[in-house]
């Protein structure tokens, strides 16, 4: 469920200096950012309903570390260059494999290593496998307590490895 994915995302956010999180819709981006803020995680939001000034302010907050999580739609997947982003999280999977590649390309820039995590629940597994099949990813389905220090290995040298987290169960407090 979306609530379970939000809880896991909050945990991921605490393990990285900063993260870019992609959502499918503008409303979903705003809602997720609000939920993360209520959990004590500083966020900024970029999507098509934001003015250029609002987008620039959000980028500046993220670059300076005032916001540790940037929640965005695919607007941020192309043309935005931010160095040293250690992790990209696909909160909502895109429909097009090219969008997955562009989103994922926001991490691991300038010769640095990066991690890509896709948060899915059990019902999304078949669609995700189909999406990733053509991208030559080594897809690893893992539980929410996955070890982020062990990234997936590329299928072939020079390709991207992806970790897809399957949210089967999240313990409640």
Where are these predicted regions, by residue range?
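Conserved helicase RecA-like core
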Residues: 1-173
């Amino acid at each position: 469920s979306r609530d379970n994915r939000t809880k896991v995302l909050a945990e991921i956010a605490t393990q990285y200096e900063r993260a870019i999180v992609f959502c499918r819709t503008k409303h979903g981006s705003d809602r997720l950012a609000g939920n993360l803020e209520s959990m004590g995680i500083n966020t900024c939001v970029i999507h098509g309903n934001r003015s250029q000034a609002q987008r620039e302010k959000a980028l500046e907050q993220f670059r300076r570390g005032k916001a540790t999580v940037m929640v965005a739609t695919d607007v941020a997947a192309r043309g935005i260059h931010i160095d040293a982003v250690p992790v990209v999280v696909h909160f909502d999977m895109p429909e097009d494999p090219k969008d997955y590649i562009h989103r994922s390309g926001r991490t691991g820039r300038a010769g640095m290593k990066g991690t890509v995590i896709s948060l899915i629940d059990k019902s999304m597994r078949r669609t995700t496998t189909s999406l990733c099949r053509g991208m030559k990813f080594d897809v690893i389905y893992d539980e929410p307590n996955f070890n982020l220090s062990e990234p997936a290995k590329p299928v072939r040298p020079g390709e991207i490895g992806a970790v897809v987290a399957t949210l089967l169960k999240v313990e409640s407090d």
